[in-house]
């Protein structure tokens, strides 16, 4: 028998090569698995601590205004803002400091594998440049725009409101005379007062509610084109009413009959406006509560669209959703519901006995990080619901996820959504209630008096004994930053964070001032 030695060696080498390939593939496979495992662990915050033990850390993101503040964690300087830093789970003290500025500090709780954002710290320059923009004998109101780009203020008994823009640089002040748009001007004197103001997105328009005694008027003020301003209370009854038009079409009335019928129906309606929300960025469309009905009004086309919901006592709006309280007299109860525009009907959230007064019921909407939130307050009971999207009226399951339920220390007199949509906030005298949606927690605290406002989206202020006290939304970092400040007026840090606008006191009267922050 003969063997081919060359063939045997070749087969053996081929088998060995195949074995090597398999071994390499197996090692590579497990190496990839191991690397993925390590990377996932790193991303989730796992580290080897000083005791050579694996420990899952959490992350804190610290920002500040101005940037470049030194970050001290538990007495050790770790970096400058803006930074992201891993910290062990548990309690830590964070201090931010910068030369020439005051200090900010907070005790934080780090959760393993979680991110904590500190995006709101603000340091105030200790020596600031102050500029007097105007000196006025007396002010009736001083209101700042939601986007922090404009100011509207008025002098007592003067129908000429002052509109201030370009807050980031050389300010521009123009007069807006309301004489032609309200009946609350007599012999050249404004006899009403500003009760409420709702700004549009670019702060070039605002819906204002003026009152005089028991009489109320709703106006749309166009600050750039005054001639396009309108007294909604006076003109709304003259708009095309789609509810009446629909009945005319159903009855198939002839032109003269339709005209007479429309006139008679309009005479029956009071067209009483009790609430207004701006439903588009340019304020050409408004969502209005008219005679207890929520209806959209097109100002350009002068149309009142068909009724969306009836028997409404109060409502709020965010995006394309409405939340409202209905008063059902026959059933002696209130019903809290939501409605998605262009849906076929409303979704009931809760029922409330009429023994609970309407002034103790609040509904608010917002959207935060892509998630939608509904807040209800009934007396001292607070609830927050969340969802990716509200269900449709005909959905099989219309229940919402109850994210938070708490009992408030007192019944609030006001409850609303903050300007940036990140908080639900309420007040009752000097008590403040705030729901932080990011952490889904309720904060309740007291301050020195009843006038508490927001200075920016995260900073609140109060005026006590002529001094402006500021504090974070959670009531930490209370500091006195100004003296000789007039109480009862708004104040604001403008949109690019360069200036602080406020009303100061002087021997010559009240002064519109601004401080340069950095």
Question: How would you name each of these model-derived features?
Answer:
Residues 66-69, 73-75, 220-222, 296-298, ...:
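A general secondary-structure boundary signal
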Residues 3-161, 197, 264-270, 276, ...:
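Short loop/turn and low-complexity linker motifs enriched in small/turn-promoting residues
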Residues 67-69, 78, 92, 101-103, ...:
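Generic "edge-of-domain/loop-turn" microfeature
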Residues 8-12, 37-43, 361-362, 402-410, ...:
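Short N-terminal helix-initiation segments at or just after the protein's N-terminus
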Residues 141-164, 198-211, 219, 246, ...:
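Short beta-strand elements that form the blades of beta-propeller/WD-repeat-like
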Residues 73, 99, 201, 299-300, ...:
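Short, ordered coil/turn segments that flank beta-strands lining enzyme active or ligand-binding pockets
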Residues 128-134, 160-187, 211-269, 289-308, ...:
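Surface-exposed loop/turn elements that mediate protein-protein interactions on large endomembrane-trafficking
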Residues 134-143, 185-198, 239-252, 258-278, ...:
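Repeated scaffold domains used in trafficking and secretory/extracellular systems
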């Amino acid at each position: 028998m003969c063997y081919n030695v060359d063939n045997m060696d070749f087969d053996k080498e081929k088998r060995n090569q195949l074995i090597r390939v398999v071994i390499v593939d197996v090692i590579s496979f497990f190496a990839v698995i191991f690397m993925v495992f390590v990377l996932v662990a790193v991303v989730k915050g796992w580290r080897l601590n000083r005791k050579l033990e694996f420990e899952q850390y959490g992350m804190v993101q610290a920002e500040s205004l101005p940037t470049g503040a030194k970050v001290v964690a538990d007495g050790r300087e770790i970096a400058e803002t803006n930074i992201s830093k891993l910290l062990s789970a548990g309690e830590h003290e964070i201090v931010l400091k910068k030369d020439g500025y005051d200090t900010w500090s907070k005790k934080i709780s780090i959760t393993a594998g979680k991110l904590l954002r500190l995006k709101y710290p603000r340091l105030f320059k200790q020596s600031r440049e102050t500029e007097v923009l105007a000196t006025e004998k007396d002010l009736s109101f001083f209101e700042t725009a939601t986007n922090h780009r404009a100011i509207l203020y008025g002098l007592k008994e003067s129908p000429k409101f002052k509109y201030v823009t370009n807050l980031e640089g050389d300010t521009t002040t123009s007069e807006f005379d309301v004489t032609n748009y309200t009946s609350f001007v007599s012999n050249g004197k404004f006899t009403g007062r500003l009760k409420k103001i709702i700004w549009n997105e670019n702060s070039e328009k605002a819906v204002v509610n003026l009152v005089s005694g028991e009489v109320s008027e709703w106006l749309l003020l166009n600050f750039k084109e005054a001639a396009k301003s309108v007294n909604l209370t006076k003109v709304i009854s003259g708009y095309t009413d789609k509810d009446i038009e629909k009945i005319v079409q159903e009855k198939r009335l002839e032109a003269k009959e339709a005209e007479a019928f429309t006139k008679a129906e309009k005479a029956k309606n009071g067209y009483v406006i009790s609430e207004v929300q701006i439903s588009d960025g340019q304020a050409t469309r408004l969502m209005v509560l008219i005679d207890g009905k929520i209806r959209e009004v097109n100002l350009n086309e002068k149309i009142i669209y068909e009724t969306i919901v009836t028997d409404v006592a109060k409502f709020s709006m965010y995006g394309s959703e409405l939340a409202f309280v209905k008063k059902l007299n026959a059933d002696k109860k209130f019903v809290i519901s939501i409605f998605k525009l262009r849906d076929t009907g409303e979704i009931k959230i809760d029922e409330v006995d009429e023994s609970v007064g309407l002034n103790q019921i609040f509904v608010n909407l917002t959207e935060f990080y892509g998630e939608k939130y509904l807040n209800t307050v009934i007396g001292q009971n607070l609830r927050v619901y969340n969802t990716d999207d509200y269900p449709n009226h005909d959905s099989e399951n219309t229940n919402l996820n109850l994210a938070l339920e708490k009992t408030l220390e007192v019944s609030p007199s006001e409850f609303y959504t903050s300007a940036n949509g990140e908080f639900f906030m309420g007040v009752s005298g000097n008590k403040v209630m705030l729901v932080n949606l990011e952490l889904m927690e309720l904060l309740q605290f007291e301050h020195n008096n009843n006038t508490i406002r927001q200075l920016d989206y995260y900073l609140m202020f109060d005026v006590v004994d002529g001094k402006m006290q500021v504090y974070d939304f959670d009531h930490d970092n209370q500091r006195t930053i100004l003296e000789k400040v007039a109480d009862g007026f708004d104040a604001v840090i403008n949109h690019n964070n360069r200036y602080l606008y406020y009303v100061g006191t002087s021997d010559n009267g009240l002064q519109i001032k601004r401080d340069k922050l950095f």
